[in-house]
Each structure stands twice: as C-alpha cells, then as structure tokens.
C-alpha cells in the first residue's frame, strides 16, 4: 500500500518524487517492523487490506519526550469516505495514549492537490503547525 500511496502522490502532482519497488518495500517494511523501528496499523476486510497508518517513534525536547510521526497514511480509493481513515486515526490516538506519546505528527502531500487530506486530518483533531518538510539525500 505504501507504493500505491507514493504512486498516487506522484500522479496527482505530475512529478515522480518516489521510486518505490514493491518487493524491496515489503522486505524493508518487514525488517523495520521486526526491529521495532516502524509500526503499522492496518484496516482489513477479511484478508483484504483497505488502508494503513505507518508510524515511527522519536523523541524531541520540543515535544517534551517521546512522540510518533505517522510516516505514511493511505486508504484505498474504493474505501475512502467510509470511516476507514477515521478508524485508523482513532486507533493511532489510542496507541499514542497507551505508549505515553506526547503527540502524533504527520505531513500532508502538497496543497492544493491534497486539500481534502488536510481537511480530513483537521476534522480528526490535527492542527497545522507550519513549516515545510525538507530532506537531504546522501550523494545529492
């Protein structure tokens, strides 16, 4: 599903920002999950995954301790606006409380193409904190 997410972002923006390969992503996901460096909440219908929230824990002084970042969040287009995303956010906030995280953070893809995503997160209790997501890649 992470590949479907990055494909959708690239398609809607008209720019190829990602180059995920499904097999490599699945192997990496399994390794990160096994090492406890990544977590995932998955919404299922029988054996069919409908959506997921992938997260990692971090610590920061500004957050006053441990917190988590929802790194990837995706619901299959056929299942959007049916409560799947809200259920995933509810599960993530419960997990945050159980683990004593001081907050959950996430980034949205660029606006205006993903305004609907921003509106969804706002309805679920997230607030815009400003800034821009930036990256540095070795060798670039």
Model-identified regions with their sequence ranges:
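Conserved acyl-CoA
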Residues: 76, 87-103, 127
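Conserved GNAT-fold acetyl-CoA-binding loop/helix
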Residues: 3-29
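Conserved beta-strand-loop-alpha-helix junction that forms the acyl-donor binding cleft
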Residues: 80, 103-117, 136-139
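Glycine-rich acyl-CoA binding loop
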Residues: 43, 81-86, 96
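Conserved acetyl-CoA-binding loop of GNAT-fold acetyltransferases
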Residues: 121-131
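A short, internal acetyl-CoA/4′-phosphopantetheine-binding micro-motif in the GNAT/acyltransferase core
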Residues: 73-80
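Conserved beta-strand in the GNAT
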Residues: 40-42, 48-57, 69
